């Protein structure tokens, strides 16, 4: 964080360097009012955590723990195990490129991602029925088969004989929970990716994914006006527009991040405090997909991973019997959003890095690992649930697209290679 303000000379503290990024610059750059939050107090917090564990576990009072039933003891033990790991991540996990609102927050997100990765690994070794029943431990309403709603049973816009309303089909879809989810989701993606052409590729690409897998999931069976007009041209467009407006608004302003103690009045102090929860930099990410064949493949890989994560939401919901309004769906989406924020920044930094030998950041690695495990869960638990095969015309269409893409990349690579040979001669 860059802070402008006068301060007394202090002993310089060099923060840990992780993936080539300095986690904390030095204490001299931190405002005096908030400098305490950047000083390491790992031993003190360890002693406080130990005292809490002694109280919660009844280590000094074994008779009290005997009165608790076995199921409750196991639940408490699992939650305590997760809490200890998250506390360790909060204090000692590797820092990322993000420094707002505090590097420790993103270390905590790193720990939550590892916990989610381990939980997915555990589920992968269960049967489908056992996994469905295990979900009851996470939410009591789960473990029950659910009816899957289809949005394309009646695609008429005007229904003259409907008892409620002649436009009832439109009203039902307009007031569906997925409308708000579309807008908020694309607003969040626009803030993360900050590149409008790439966002539109993802928007249209996901609608093509819905068309591709509509024979497997009734939820993807939508009317043409729902998919094209409502989803792409209204909800997705509004979310992308609002997100890019947010980025341009903050990107076009000049900031002097004066410390909290130097703000002139209460209103300024409140604004500065709220500003701590916004990104330090709002500059738009440049991906340059047409820089070369390899860069094109790298950006295309990002789009593919994005769409796989989106598809995993619906397939996991279908396979594990999780209703759309269950809070677990929201928790997973919020966790993925928190993971994706540093992942996008790390991946963009990785693409822009000119070093001959480089590696992706820890969040990039975790995101890819979680995506793969979710996909494996969908494949394993979805076995036998989708009796309908893909229509032949759809298979031919995607095969043609893949073949044309391969030919395009080969011709592009050959032209670049031929140009390099001519320059050497």
Curated annotation (Swiss-Prot):
<keyword id="KW-1133">Transmembrane helix</keyword>
<dbReference type="GO" id="GO:0006646">
    <property type="term" value="P:phosphatidylethanolamine biosynthetic process"/>
</dbReference>
<feature type="transmembrane region" description="Helical">
    <location>
        <begin position="197"/>
        <end position="217"/>
    </location>
</feature>
<feature type="transmembrane region" description="Helical">
    <location>
        <begin position="224"/>
        <end position="244"/>
    </location>
</feature>
<dbReference type="Pfam" id="PF03034">
    <property type="entry name" value="PSS"/>
</dbReference>
<dbReference type="GO" id="GO:0005789">
    <property type="term" value="C:endoplasmic reticulum membrane"/>
</dbReference>
<keyword id="KW-0594">Phospholipid biosynthesis</keyword>
<feature type="transmembrane region" description="Helical">
    <location>
        <begin position="393"/>
        <end position="413"/>
    </location>
</feature>
<feature type="transmembrane region" description="Helical">
    <location>
        <begin position="366"/>
        <end position="386"/>
    </location>
</feature>
<comment type="similarity">
    <text>Belongs to the CDP-alcohol phosphatidyltransferase class-I family.</text>
</comment>
<dbReference type="GO" id="GO:0006659">
    <property type="term" value="P:phosphatidylserine biosynthetic process"/>
</dbReference>
<keyword id="KW-0812">Transmembrane</keyword>
<dbReference type="InterPro" id="IPR004277">
    <property type="entry name" value="PSS"/>
</dbReference>
<keyword id="KW-0808">Transferase</keyword>
<feature type="transmembrane region" description="Helical">
    <location>
        <begin position="79"/>
        <end position="99"/>
    </location>
</feature>
<keyword id="KW-1208">Phospholipid metabolism</keyword>
<keyword id="KW-0443">Lipid metabolism</keyword>
<protein>
    <recommendedName>
        <fullName>CDP-diacylglycerol--serine O-phosphatidyltransferase 1</fullName>
        <ecNumber>2.7.8.8</ecNumber>
    </recommendedName>
</protein>
<dbReference type="GO" id="GO:0003882">
    <property type="term" value="F:CDP-diacylglycerol-serine O-phosphatidyltransferase activity"/>
</dbReference>
<comment type="function">
    <text>Catalyzes a base-exchange reaction in which the polar head group of phosphatidylethanolamine (PE) or phosphatidylcholine (PC) is replaced by L-serine.</text>
</comment>
<dbReference type="GO" id="GO:0106245">
    <property type="term" value="F:L-serine-phosphatidylethanolamine phosphatidyltransferase activity"/>
</dbReference>
<feature type="transmembrane region" description="Helical">
    <location>
        <begin position="42"/>
        <end position="62"/>
    </location>
</feature>
<feature type="transmembrane region" description="Helical">
    <location>
        <begin position="321"/>
        <end position="341"/>
    </location>
</feature>
<keyword id="KW-0444">Lipid biosynthesis</keyword>
<feature type="transmembrane region" description="Helical">
    <location>
        <begin position="105"/>
        <end position="125"/>
    </location>
</feature>
<comment type="pathway">
    <text>Phospholipid metabolism; phosphatidylethanolamine biosynthesis; phosphatidylethanolamine from CDP-diacylglycerol: step 1/2.</text>
</comment>
<feature type="transmembrane region" description="Helical">
    <location>
        <begin position="296"/>
        <end position="316"/>
    </location>
</feature>
<keyword id="KW-0256">Endoplasmic reticulum</keyword>
<keyword id="KW-0472">Membrane</keyword>
């Amino acid at each position: 964080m860059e802070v402008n303000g006068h301060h007394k000379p202090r002993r310089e503290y060099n923060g840990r360097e992780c993936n080539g990024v300095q986690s904390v610059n030095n204490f001299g750059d931190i405002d005096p009012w908030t400098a305490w939050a950047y000083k390491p107090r790992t031993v003190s917090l360890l002693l406080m955590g130990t005292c809490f564990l002694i109280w919660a576990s009844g280590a000094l009072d074994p008779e009290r723990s005997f009165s608790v039933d076995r199921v409750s003891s196991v639940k408490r033990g699992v939650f305590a195990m997760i809490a200890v790991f998250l506390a360790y991540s909060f204090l000692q996990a590797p820092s990322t490129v993000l420094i707002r609102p505090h590097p420790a927050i993103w270390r905590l997100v790193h720990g939550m991602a590892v916990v989610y990765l381990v939980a997915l690994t555990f589920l992968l070794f269960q049967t489908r029925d056992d996994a469905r029943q295990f979900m009851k431990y996470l939410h009591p309403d789960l473990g029950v088969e659910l009816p899957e709603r289809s949005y394309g049973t009646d695609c008429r816009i005007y229904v003259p004989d409907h008892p409620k309303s002649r436009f009832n089909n439109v009203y039902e879809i307009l007031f569906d929970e997925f409308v708000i989810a579309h807008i908020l989701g694309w607003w969040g993606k626009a803030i993360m990716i900050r590149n409008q052409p790439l966002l539109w590729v993802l928007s249209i690409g996901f609608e093509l994914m819905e068309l591709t897998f509509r024979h497997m999931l009734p939820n993807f069976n939508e009317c043409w006006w729902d998919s094209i007009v409502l989803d792409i041209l209204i909800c997705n467009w509004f979310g992308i527009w609002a997100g890019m407006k947010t980025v341009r608004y903050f990107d076009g302003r000049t900031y002097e991040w004066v410390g909290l103690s130097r703000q002139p009045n209460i209103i300024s102090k409140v604004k500065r405090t709220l500003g701590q929860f916004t990104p330090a930099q709002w500059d738009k990410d440049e991906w340059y997909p047409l820089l070369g064949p390899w860069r094109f493949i790298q950006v295309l890989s990002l789009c593919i991973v994005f769409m796989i994560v989106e598809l995993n939401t619906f397939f996991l919901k279908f396979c594990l019997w999780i209703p759309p309004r269950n809070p677990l769906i929201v928790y997973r989406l919020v966790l993925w959003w928190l993971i994706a924020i540093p992942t996008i920044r790390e991946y963009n930094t990785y693409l822009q890095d000119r070093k001959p030998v480089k590696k992706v950041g820890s969040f990039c690695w975790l995101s890819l690992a979680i995506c793969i495990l979710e996909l494996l869960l969908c494949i394993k638990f979805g076995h036998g649930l989708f009796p309908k095969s893909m229509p032949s015309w759809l298979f031919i269409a995607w095969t043609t697209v893949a073949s044309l893409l391969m030919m395009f990349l080969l011709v592009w690579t050959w032209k670049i290679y031929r140009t390099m040979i001519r320059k050497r001669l």
